[in-house]
Each structure stands twice: as C-alpha cells, then as structure tokens.
Amino acid sequence: MTELERRANEMRSDIVRMIAEAGSGHPGGSLSCADILAALYFGGVLDHDPERPDWDERDRFILAKGHAAPALYAVLAQAGYFPREELLTLRKLGTRLQGHPDSNLVPGVEVSTGSLGQGLSVAAGAAAGLKLDGKPQTVFALLGDGECQEGQVWEAAMFAAHRNLDNLVACLLYTSPSPRDLSTS
C-alpha cells in the first residue's frame, strides 16, 4: 500500500466514524472524494500550509459538492489544520464542523459551499482574480457528476475557456450512471 492509499483509507475511516457519530450525513459522496483529496493534499499537487491557512501564496481548493464536507474535514485534520479529535463533533450544535463547510469557521476551507452548481463559478472567479493579479497559484475545484447538469457549471466552464484560465483545475467525480443512462426506452 502506498502512502497516498494509506492516507485515503485513513480518511475513509474518519469519514465513517464522523457520520456514524453524527447520525446523519452523506457517506457515499464523502467516501468517493478520499483518493482525490489524498493526491491533492499529500501528493505534492496542492501548495498549502496548515500553519498559515490564509497564506497568500497558497493554492486554493474548493469543494463544490459541499455535502461531502466530512471528506474535506478529514483531509484538513490529517494535514494539521485542526485536531483530529474534533472530527467527532460533526453536525453537533455549536461545533464549527457542520454539514456543509463554512469558510468563516474552519481553517483551510476556502469557500462556504453547499448549493450544487456554484463551486466551479466561484473557482473560475478566484482563478481569474489570481491571473489578473499576475499570481501563479492554481485553483482546484472538486465537482460531483450530478451538479454538472446545472447550467451555471457550463457557463463557468465557458468563462474559464474564454479567459484562458490555465490556473483552474476542475476534478469531476463520476460515481455512477444516472437513471437516464440506465433507461431501456
């Protein structure tokens, strides 16, 4: 087992424990993110610093599918943004680890997300801003396959192409065929 596989499996374990302790959540959407998050955060792809979450030179990661927040919390805790013990406070009253990520509460969360289809637009705007400022950072967005049916996602993709945003990386999780793909009629 490679180090990245070990980290992804550790995240999956944390995700299952968090959701079981909370008694609610989105296990499938969260578990499906582990490999990508391990590669980004621990594979030398995403330039970040848990000691300085607001470091100006950091790359940005936007979890467009905000309902998969347990996966983001698991990778952030593993990376050292906050103590892993805090993971078991998911969805409890008064905790900062809610069902959708909140950038005002959780270090390492770039954008509060939850409404499907908006993450890529935010990421494209951030990438455009960095590019206009002449900064070399990259913006990564993780989208679910279901939200790609939102028109806003395609508008953001067209904007990114038109603006030549080569500092924007969209990762798409294709987890299963839609019922329409399975139709026999």
Residue ranges of each PLM-predicted region?
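N-terminal capping segment at the start of a domain
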Residues: A8-S24, L173
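Short internal beta-strands
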Residues: L63, N167-L173
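Flexible, compositionally biased loop and terminal segments
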Residues: M1, R6-N9, C33
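Single conserved hydrophobic/aromatic residue that forms the stacking wall/gate
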Residues: Y174-S185
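Cofactor-binding active-site loop characterized by glycine-rich and histidine/acidic residues
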Residues: I15-M18, S30-H162
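Short acidic/polar active-site loop segments enriched in Thr and Asp
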Residues: G25, D166
